[in-house]
Amino acid sequence: KAGFTRSGPDMWHINCRPDHLIASAKKSLQKLGLERIPLWQLHRIDSRVPRAEQFGAVKQLLDEGLIAHAGLSEVSVADIKAASAVFPVATVQNSYNLADRHSDDVVDYCAASGIGFIPYYPLGGDGELTRAGGALDKLAKAKGVTQGQVALAWLLKRSPTMLPIPGTSKVAHLEENVAAAGLALTDEEFAALDRKRR
């Protein structure tokens, strides 16, 4: 990812000036020891920099072979369309989970356009949905799995281009998350969870 500068602990600022984006990509290549970054995300669109300049910098990185694929983060459908007019958008990363559905239209657009959708905070949820005895809890217990596994299975059923990458710090959690890919929700189970949030 690129598009931020850091001025201190927990002090991040959007910076999508073309020179900064290109320098950030080159620095990442050096740190990673790569000749090309497989997937590079524009972390935010900078309201202070003309979009044509930001998107042009991404295209330059692609044209020069420094990145293989480019994505966007925290964008609308209109943003994706504008960027797609300049470079091929491979992925979009927005906040999205069972409880946070503000990007439903973006998920649908990405699916229709063959763009990968990476949900930020995929295991997020609110008290009503995740409380003991709630819909998610009941379904997880009925299937003998965790609430997190059901939440991931719901995301995977939600869209064919959904690419959840839940953060984890323990091998047991990693194995649990991977196992969610084999958990199939019925249409009725999916719809029941879907209705709880709409």
Predicted regions and their residues:
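Short, acidic/polar
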Residues: 16-32, 76-82
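Active-site groove signature of glycoside hydrolases
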Residues: 29-50
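Beta/alpha (TIM)-barrel catalytic core signal, keyed to glycine-rich beta->alpha loops juxtaposed to Asp/Glu
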Residues: 45-198
